[in-house]
Amino acid sequence: EATYFDFNEEVLSGIIKDAADMGFELFLLDDGWFANKYPRDNDKAGLGDWNYNKKKLPHGLGYLVNESKKKGIKFGIWLEPEMVNPKSELYEKHPDWVIGQPNRPLDLSRNQLILDLSNPKVQDFVFGVIDKTLSENPGIAYIKWDCNRFVTNSGSYFLSPEKQSHLWIGYVRGLFSVLDRVRAKYKDVSMM
């Protein structure tokens, strides 16, 4: 968070060097590294579009992972895969993937909505985000898995009307399913 959303590859490389010189063990790339159509330059857009920002990181995440490795420190990445901004490609494609009650306005908190992990398609998407990020950048050693808002307006566009009371159970089971899949494939990657 030393740079908030205002950084580029050169700035981050300098921070990695400084961190290594001070004896740090890990560099964590926080929020703002992703999204292109709606760049993540503030907290109002891009959340959910988990492709590295080509303007900020023209050589991709792998470049920074390698810079960290060269300096002898581990590389960590910030993700908040359960959340989405309405101003994102993900929300444009899948507005029915969020938690909300039919026939009621959506309730934004921190400019974001919550993805409905009771939906297996959402579970696959969230796992896919993590899987793609880690498989394309095998030197990532740590995931900071953020979740910065509380659930309001709870309802599921996926669950039938009779099953709406099962949202919480389905959500937690869906989250645990994703975490189990990540842990099974990436045993050596720490998550918080």
How would you describe each model-predicted region?
Residues 3-92, 121-128, 170-177:
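Aromatic- and glycine-enriched glycan-recognition loops and surfaces
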